Amino acid sequence: MIVGVAYAKPTVQVWKHVDVPEGTSAREAIERSGLLAQFPEIDLAVNKVGIFGAICPLDRTLAEGDRVEIYRPIHPEAELLEKKR
């Protein structure tokens, strides 16, 4: 089955389609996507993940067409930085 795995930084967004077997978890799809090697700053012990904007555990079993999103931690002063713009 085909699922998507997405990660975004302020300067680059990546969305990969990954062919995975039935029963694949979010963690397994992320590992198969190659994004952990491409973006070594991703730490699955720290970064939250979700499917279509809803946070989920890494062991969540995926369905055909799901989009797994890897979220960056929010900077503690992000709101202040946004107001300065």
From Swiss-Prot:
Highest rank taxon of the organism: Bacteria
Disulfide cysteine pairs (residue numbers): none
A Pfam cross-reference name: Ub-RnfH
SUPFAM superfamilies in the cross-refs: MoaD/ThiS
UniProt xrefs under InterPro entries: Mopterin_synth/thiamin_S_b (IPR016155), RnfH (IPR005346), RnfH_sf (IPR037021)
PANTHER family xref list: UPF0125 PROTEIN RATB (PTHR37483:SF1)
Annotated family: Belongs to the UPF0125 (RnfH) family.
Protein name listed in UniProt: Protein RnfH
